[in-house]
């Protein structure tokens, strides 16, 4: 292991001892459980949010008129309510002269695959990719486990981490993207979404409510117009506009915020050996093992160490990108996917093309290419140990 990686592991990723202790504790919540240590009031908020997360919407309450599904949990089921899934959504746009155009005239960049049907003389059907698009990408559904911990990481930590990478691992250095958070109106460092395009759990929840189900709120009041045809919205049967107050997204946010991180398997000898290889070949340069929350009024989120195996920064992934620009991220940049909970997934990478962890590693390009090549050069036993480690997360 080079001195550079020793420094990296020592300052930002010293997870070997910590993981061994945590995985051996036997006291972790199960998939889908709330964080440990919640007060009765917070536990009630978690349960109310979970019930709302599972509750289906209908056209009269604001569903659609074009949408992707009727309830959050329809897409978030893997492992437990709040998990990911292999379902894919479609994004599109147009690139000319190296500049990404989101084709806003079609209400881009997300295809809403379903419509609410016939109302007031209009047959609302699912959308299609417009012929003007020359970039089409698919994205699988990310799990929500542990996102309250991610939300509670101070912005300054992510900025410092990006600077640390620039100083010590410049070839793989990520970017901390600063954006205006819709829910708070404040400048935040993005950390959610495939492009780190969202800064807080509340904005994430409200954005999904509008984008995936078409439910408008004061946070996101823009109605989904089928293929961008706003004239059709006059036939929308929704009874209020916005369709919802901000209450429901806040309830979703309660569920997500208090949802525990994925439990990790007890560490075998092979997994421990694999962890050393994981650190040694540079995986941890981006898939940072350990993070810590800042001061928080919720004790379960207050200065807690957790193990996401992501730096929550964006990196230039070369050919392993989706081409979709989501400001401030470019089409080339993708967020480092957290590896916690990897063992229950059945597809990997943003578009689900990889069906095994090994395939996902071998598909790395751009700033992930060097680590990919080091993995490819390992002996088969070393590869097996590394994969055993990732499958313990």
Regions from the language model: what does each represent?
Residues 21-393:
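Periplasmic c-type cytochrome electron-transfer domains
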Residues 3-4, 17, 90-93:
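Short, intrinsically disordered low-complexity segments
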């Amino acid at each position: 292991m080079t001195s550079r990686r020793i420094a990296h592991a020592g300052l930002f990723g010293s997870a070997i001892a910590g993981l061994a202790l945590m995985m051996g504790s036997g006291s972790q919540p199960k998939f889908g459980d709330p964080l440990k240590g919640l007060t009765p009031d917070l536990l009630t908020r978690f349960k109310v949010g979970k019930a709302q997360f599972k509750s289906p919407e209908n056209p009269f309450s604001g569903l659609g008129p074009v949408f992707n599904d009727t309830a959050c949990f329809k897409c978030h089921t893997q492992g437990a309510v709040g998990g990911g899934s292999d379902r894919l959504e479609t994004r599109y746009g147009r690139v000319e002269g190296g500049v990404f155009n989101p084709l806003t005239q079609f209400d881009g960049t997300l295809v809403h695959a379903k419509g609410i049907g016939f109302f007031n003389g209009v047959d609302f059907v699912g959308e299609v990719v417009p012929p003007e698009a020359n970039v089409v990408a698919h994205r699988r559904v990310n799990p929500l486990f542990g996102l309250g911990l991610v939300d509670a990481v101070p912005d300054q930590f992510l900025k410092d981490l990006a600077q640390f990478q620039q100083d010590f691992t410049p070839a793989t250095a990520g970017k901390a993207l600063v954006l205006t958070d819709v829910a708070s109106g404040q400048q935040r460092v993005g950390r959610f979404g495939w492009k780190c395009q969202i800064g807080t759990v509340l904005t994430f929840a409200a954005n999904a409510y509008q984008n995936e189900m078409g439910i408008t709120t004061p946070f996101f009041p823009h109605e989904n117009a089928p293929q961008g045809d706003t004239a059709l919205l006059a036939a929308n049967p929704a009874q209020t506009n916005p369709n919802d107050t901000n209450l429901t997204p806040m309830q979703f946010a309660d569920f997500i915020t208090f949802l525990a991180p994925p439990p990790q398997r007890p560490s075998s000898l092979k997994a421990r050996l694999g962890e050393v290889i994981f650190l040694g070949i540079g995986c941890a340069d981006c898939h940072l093992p350990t993070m810590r929350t800042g001061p928080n009024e919720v004790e379960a989120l207050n200065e807690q160490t957790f193990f996401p195996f992501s730096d929550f920064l964006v990196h230039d992934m070369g050919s392993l990108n989706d081409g979709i620009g989501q400001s401030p991220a470019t089409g080339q940049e993708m967020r480092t996917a957290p590896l916690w909970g990897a063992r229950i997934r059945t597809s990997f990478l943003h578009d689900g093309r990889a069906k095994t962890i090994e395939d996902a590693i071998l598909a790395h390009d751009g700033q992930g290419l060097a680590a990919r090549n080091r993995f490819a050069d390992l002996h088969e036993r070393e590869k097996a140990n590394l994969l055993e480690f990732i499958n313990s997360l």
